[in-house]
Structure formats: structure tokens, C-alpha cells
């Protein structure tokens, strides 16, 4: 093979009249009588090749035999295209290569789908032939963007005194929330390693060891149910620092984000990011990860309706609940009763019993509950509505109201075109509760993880009323997605033991699960804190994708399997025998894990 002159996608006017050697894949071939045109593709783009008897008869014959996805090498001379043949949509659209030599480096079967963007093909097929799917320009762009982000992260953190330290992939299983992926030990029959759900404890130990500033592009593993922005194995930008306050850690993180946004997107984000308390986020936006690209804040009308004749509202307030509302600008004419009722059915999944609504008219109000509120002037004024608006109400317990209206706010924000899809709005959500109640397992669990330091003024509550305590924790949010989360950590053994006790750990169980950390805290740990940013999600948002599978080279599908390699699959009996493992077919995985502690961040 000859040495390549440049990438096919980089052949521009500067190469005119020069001899070039190019290599790549055949995107398509077109035969026009005595001429053959081939689009040659590589990672940088496509350039048009021209074959003719005038240039070389043998090359023309070979070109006539190639098919899509053949791998070829060509030599030829770059020429300007005729004005009528210029393609302004291509970087190389001003030129073409008149080829005199072509070599077929490899042939290809007909692919199961066209290698181009926008092709209709099932997700399963794309994953089965991932090496073909990754040839598509948009997929290559996603992976290159990911690499660009990682390079920017490394540069910023290296320049700011952080040291890149690898932590173990084979470690001990600890109750951190999601199920662990377990790795059996051949040397210690009946014992297992766990793949890390995060480097959390190791990075804290590194602070105890005096490294002061740690970072890692860390691979993490969680055996949990999947969705569009989750994978069983994922990557996070992991940071930890000593002797810094939460505000100082947030400042460093903002600097990191600002550099990435500048380097990768050419955007100078506004600093500092907005800060909103957890309670305000829930009250105003119905979410602990609010999308601030549009307003539509939730309004509390509990006081106004607590004595109304509409018993649904009055009863909710009397029973300790709330009545809150959102205003859909111009929604009165846009949404029919049938369309509103469809959302009423949807929000029942949040526990809401129904959805009340009013349309604001020039004469007052109309709708199913209008008769209970006269002309509705006070209600309309309270929520800030105008003629032509639609007002939606939910009455229930605070969490149900927040979850339901938070969903409705996002849904209608998109539907009404209120969201600038090109915008990037970052914010911090701070002052979190230390604990939250998990309705599913009927138990108090950490809002983040059990190593989070309470606010200084709330430390005493660990002895008396731990569920009233707030935490020194903070989440960074981008466009309605949790981009990352962090906290100041507990660096005092006594406080850590109280935290575990509040979670129901006996001293014996605490020592068994976290003894190595508790023992380490006896040896002079500095105050420390950190943060982890989900790299996959960050790349997804910066590339405008809606599924993280599109920004991971070899992801799993929604069932946590990989169609390309057929993983996971049964292994040989001999391998199981070496590990002392017997496979049972009668195990219900859900039942086996009933009662597991949820200690997730």
C-alpha cells in the first residue's frame, strides 16, 4: 500500500492539480456511460472520484466491479469541478479526483442497511451490526465529540492541580443502592468481587492519603432497570478535593463545564450558574432537575381555594395537601377536552387522582370547575393568566402534586414550542434533604449516598430527628437532566457511624460493610468533597441526541444485552465448576432482592 496523502474528507481546493493517494470505503457508485463516479468515504467525509478511459482504461474496469462498502485505495489528480457540478453542501464539493490507479483492499457483502444518516432501521439491527452503524457520519461525529470532551476535561483538570488516579475495577460489594455486578473468585470459592458502582469510597480514601485533588474518567457498573439515559456500564467524570467548601467545588466545576462548552461547542456560558434550593425547585418546577430554558412556574393556590365549594380542592388542603397550578399560554384554543383528559390518565402514574382545568376567556373563565369560582378573577390573578390561556390544577400530597405538574410543565413546554432547543441552561440544585422516603420499599434512604455530610447546624439531628436534616450536597442540572451530583463528605468517624445508624445499620453490620472506611477515618481525614458528572449524558446533550446509546461506541440494548456479541450468554460447565458455581433455573431475581437497602446517590 502507498502512503495516504490526506483524508478523503479533507481534499479541498488547496490540492487542485496535485497527485493524491486516498483510502476509504465506497459510499456509492454511479455509472454514466463512459464515466464512473464513486463517492469515497472516510472518517472526515466524502470526496467524489471520477474514472474514465481518458485517465486509465484498467482503473475504469476495476471501478466498474466495486460495490458499496468495498475498501479501496486510489491515486489520482485533484481537479476543480465544473461550476454546474459544484456541491455546496459538501466540504469537498468544489473538487473531484480524476483517478488513474485503483486497488481493491477488501470486498464487502451487501450491508443489512444503507450506511447513511436517516435510514429507517430497527435499534436491534443497528446494535447487531454496530461496526456498520458506527460508519455513519452522525455516529462518527458523536464519538469524536465524546473524545473532544474527554480531552478538554483532562486538560482543564491537569492544569488545575488534579491528579489522574485509577481505582480498582474488582472490589468489594457494598450496599450502595443498585444491584452489583458480581465476579466470582476462583481462588476463593464462594466469594465474589463486585464491579464498582462508583469510585466513591476509594476517592475518599485518596483524600485521606493526602493527594488533595483527584480525578478519573471512571467506568461504573449498576445492575438496574434501563431507560434512554441509562446503561448498565457507564462513564463518569469523577472529582474529589480536600479542604474546599461546597462553593469552591462548584466554582471549579463551573470552570470545567465552561471550558468544555467553549472547546467543543464554541459557546461561552454565563458564569456563575444559577443556584436554586431543592425545595424551590420542587415548588416552582415540580422537579429536582428543573429545565430553566422556559418559565411556566408552578403556582400555589392552596390558600385561595381551601374554603371553596369545590370539595376536591378544599379536601386536599384540609388533609394536609396542596393545590397547585400551571398556566399554558394560548392553550385555551389549542387543547380540547379530549386532549386534556389524555394527560389526566397519564399523570395517574404519579399517584394523582385527576386533573382539573379552566380556560380563561375575555368574559371570565370556563370549564368543568368554573361554576365553583364565580368569575374566577382572584384565581386568574393569582396564577398570572390572561385571556386565551389554559390553567391546569392538581390537588394532592406535595410530592404527587410536584411530580404530576413537573411532568405536565415539561410536556406542554415542548408541545407549545416554549423551549429553545439550541439553548444550554445550567443550574445548581442545593440544600437537599439528607434523607428521602422511598414509597416502593417503605423506608427512609439517603437522598444521595450515606457518606454525605449534613449541614453543620443539622449534625445534632442525627441523634434526634435525622429525617429533618439537610445535606451539604449539590446537583448540577442541564436542560432538565441531572448532569452530575456531589457533596461534602463525612470525614469524622462518629458522624459516619450515626449516619449509618439512622439508616438502620447495627454497629456490627456497619463494620462488616464499611469497616475499612470507618477504620480509615480514625487516622486524620481532611474535610473533603467532590462531584461526579455523567459523561455519557453530557455527550448526549451536547450532540442533541435523546438516547445515550448513540454516544457510546458499543452500548447495551434496553434489556442490558449486546446483540453483536450475544452477551450475556451461558458459559461452559467446566468454567462454572472451576468457580464452584451451580446455575439454578428456579430463581426469581426480583424476589431474591426484596428488602435490599437503597443507598443510591
From Swiss-Prot:
ATP binds at residues 222-224, 231, 482, 534-537. It catalyses: tRNA(Asp) + L-aspartate + ATP = L-aspartyl-tRNA(Asp) + AMP + diphosphate. Its main location: cytoplasm. Catalyzes the attachment of L-aspartate to tRNA(Asp) in a two-step reaction: L-aspartate is first activated by ATP to form Asp-AMP and then transferred to the acceptor end of tRNA(Asp). One of its GO terms (biological process) is aspartyl-tRNA aminoacylation. Belongs to the class-II aminoacyl-tRNA synthetase family. Type 1 subfamily. The keyword Nucleotide-binding applies. One of its GO terms (cellular component) is cytoplasm. GO terms for molecular function: aspartate-tRNA ligase activity; ATP binding; catalytic activity, acting on a protein; nucleic acid binding; transferase activity. Residues 200-203 are annotated as: Aspartate. Keywords: Aminoacyl-tRNA synthetase, ATP-binding, Cytoplasm, Ligase, Nucleotide-binding, Protein biosynthesis. The gene is aspS. Its EC number is 6.1.1.12. PROSITE patterns: AA_TRNA_LIGASE_II. Homodimer. This is Aspartate--tRNA ligase. It is found in: Cytoplasm. Gene3D superfamilies: Bira Bifunctional Protein, Domain 2, GAD-like domain, Nucleic acid-binding proteins. NCBIfam families: aspS_bact, PRK00476.1. The keyword Ligase applies.
